[in-house]
Amino acid sequence: MDSKILIIYNAILVDSSIENPGLVVVKNGKICGVFLGEVKNSEMAFVIASSVLPEIKGNPVFFDAKGLVLMPSFVDMHVHFRYPGQTQKEDLDSGLRAAAAGGFGTVVTMPNTAPVVSSAKLARQIMSEASEKKLARVFQTVSITKNFEGEDVSEIQNLSVEEFPVISEDGREVVNSAVMLEGMKAAGKNSIIVSCHCEDPFLAAAARPYRQRALKFMENYNIPAGKVNVVTQNVPDSVNFEKIGRAHV
């Protein structure tokens, strides 16, 4: 069977170490050659590519990327595809198409679905379905505790970092410090990243009615507000809340 060759030329190639004009040769869906330097037309592109890669024969497809930047695909470490159980919001197909359209080749999906992704079995099923769509690679996180209940970390004890590089309780915190420590130890022994939502849920709940009251006042009376600085002793940072509902924040 003939190989499918794509030659992308006249692009600006950008990664962590370069920002130069050049061309890229793709064979059967995989990059097999990168050449730096200005290449103005398809004839020049073919001469350069075939002189170094003699396997380039036949009629390759040429793409003139003039005015475009060519970069490696991006990685999004926190996405919500809402699958399974919340597909009225998003699903694998729409999420993966959006990722591919935005240049994201790898995404890490959160476990707050219905049911919660608390087992390797369910996570593998989701990743298998995603891979069949051939749009972007999905790493499905497993919840730190079973069903977000904050008690049982048995499901993460034997995960492999190759399959599950990240675990997360997503938009909540494991309140019990002993349970969180056990979960971190389980992840640490396998070099798995623990993505934490560092927020005391009791303090967050207490603040909610006051936040809602302020937003309602701003919305009803068209009152603008500036930045709200949230400062702790060790994290002198600010959070910029922008356009919550119809309030101008």
Descriptions of predicted regions:
Residues D93-V117, K134-K146, S160-V175, S191-E199, ...:
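Divalent metal-dependent hydrolysis catalytic cores, especially in the metallo-beta-lactamase
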Residues I56, A65-A130:
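Metal-associated gating/positioning segment near the N- to mid-region
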Residues M127-K133, I156-V161:
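Acidic (Asp/Glu)-rich catalytic clusters
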Residues A11, V24, G29, G67, ...:
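Divalent metal-coordination and catalytic microenvironments
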Residues M1-E55:
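N-terminal metal-binding scaffold of metallo-dependent hydrolase/deaminase domains
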Residues G102-F104, S128-R137, P201-R246:
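Active-site gating loops and adjacent loop-to-helix segments of metal-dependent hydrolytic enzymes
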Residues V116-I126, E173-A186:
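Active-site-adjacent beta->alpha loops and helix N-cap segments on the catalytic face
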